[in-house]
Amino acid sequence: MNNMKSTFLFLLTTTMMTCTAYGQSSNHKENKLPDWAFGGFERPKNVNPVISPIENTKFYCPLTKDSIAWESNDTFNPAATLYNGEIVVLYRAEDKSGVGIGHRTSRLGYATSTDGTHFQREKTPVFYPDNDSQKELEWPGGCEDPRIAVTDDGLYVMMYTQWNRHVPRLAVATSRNLKDWTKHGPAFAKAFDGKFFNLGCKSGSILTEVVKGKQVIKKVNGKYFMYRSEEHTSELQSPMFIS
């Protein structure tokens, strides 16, 4: 289990190197980080990228009502966590419905690993735009850039970007098994009477701490704490992590 935890921390720090747009570096340098940070990691040789685009995995899209090669163009910007003794990665995958980042549709794929370098992937996405309450905010751009943290009782909280090709919005979803998700909508929909609803925002990371060897969501003065960015990085607090 210690090896599993070490591998998981490596994955979080290196962001998995799944984006095929970046090459491997031949220089192996130790990260020099503050005492509070996870450090001392090296990029392994001859294993990257660990998740690459696949042309022949098909998914029936409920919005286009057609079979889509949903991960044929890009696989990148993943989140990694632990579930039932395995590393689970949710990765952003793009189809070929457009040209250029932001002009295709993104969905989230699911992959598992016991060693952090060899992955088994599900053939269909586990999170995607659907005929649901979030369709207007997620279609046609999709669901992007997951960030996952877990509570001490095992509830996984995912911050992700809703992209309707007009405004990127940071949104929240929760799950107990990382496959069946409940969408809660934009994170700031209710803040200050909706003042920030149309403000572009993404890349939300919830503050965590290590408790008895497990990385869990932490409260600060009775509130949840999150960093987010879009042009600028800012700090946010909330008594509830779903709004």
Where would I find each of the regions flagged by the language model?
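Bacterial Sec-dependent N-terminal signal peptides
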Residues: 1-27
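Beta-rich carbohydrate-recognition and catalytic domains
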Residues: 24-77, 81-141, 149-238, 243
